[in-house]
């Protein structure tokens, strides 16, 4: 689930929220390949882009290759580590790299990974998180023409409880206008 490579240079680059530790090998994600929005919870009570990045840097592929860092494209805070409802884009989004969030090659390559801080098996996301997520999902779905049926929870692509039983996925999907 690692990613390597860079987006072709087509303008000014923004400074990543967290820069990867390893250089890419030239793999590129063509424009227009985003087809899914994959929603996750961190499974923790607190967290930030930086803390998840450090944790994910410790992970390795089956062949021993280290991950570049944070697996997601966006993180939404809950007030413990990041402001409640704060949305941060990670280096994967800023450089248009595929994710390492889904445990499935297709959904890593074609899915935008969005992680909300919290464990939604135990507590529901905050209203601020849900408002921020609805806004983000609506904007991304419109920009990349992603239909609401392709706004999914992580559990749709891998056997997991993520994003948790208390996560209101249907409400998020309904925020995306019908095509």
Go through each PLM region and give its residues.
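Short, charge-rich binding segments
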Residues: 65, 104-105
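Conserved beta-strand segments of the P-loop GTPase G domain that flank and frequently precede/overlap
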Residues: 40, 115-116
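Basic/polar, cationic surfaces and motifs that engage anionic cell-wall
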Residues: 1-34, 78-81, 86-89, 93, ...
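Flexible, surface-exposed loop/gating regions in the mature catalytic domains
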Residues: 96-103
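Short, conserved "active-site rim" segments that organize catalytic pockets and cofactor/ligand binding
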Residues: 25-95
């Amino acid at each position: 689930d690692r990613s390597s490579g860079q987006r072709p240079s087509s303008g000014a680059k923004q400074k990543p929220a967290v820069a990867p530790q390893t250089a890419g090998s030239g793999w590129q994600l063509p424009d227009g390949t985003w087809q899914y929005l994959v929603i996750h919870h961190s499974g923790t009570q607190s967290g930030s882009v930086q803390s998840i990045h450090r944790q994910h840097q410790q992970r390795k592929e089956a062949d021993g290759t280290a991950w570049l860092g944070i697996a997601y494209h966006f993180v939404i805070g809950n007030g413990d580590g990041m402001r409640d409802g704060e949305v941060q884009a990670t280096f994967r989004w800023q450089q248009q790299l595929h994710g390492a969030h889904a445990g499935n090659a297709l959904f890593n390559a074609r899915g935008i990974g969005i992680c909300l801080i919290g464990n939604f098996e135990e507590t529901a996301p905050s209203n601020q998180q849900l408002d921020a997520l609805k806004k983000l999902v609506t904007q991304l779905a419109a920009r990349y023409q992603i239909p609401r049926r392709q706004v999914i929870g992580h559990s749709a692509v891998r056997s997991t409880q993520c994003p948790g039983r208390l996560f209101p996925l249907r409400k998020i999907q309904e925020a995306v206008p019908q095509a």
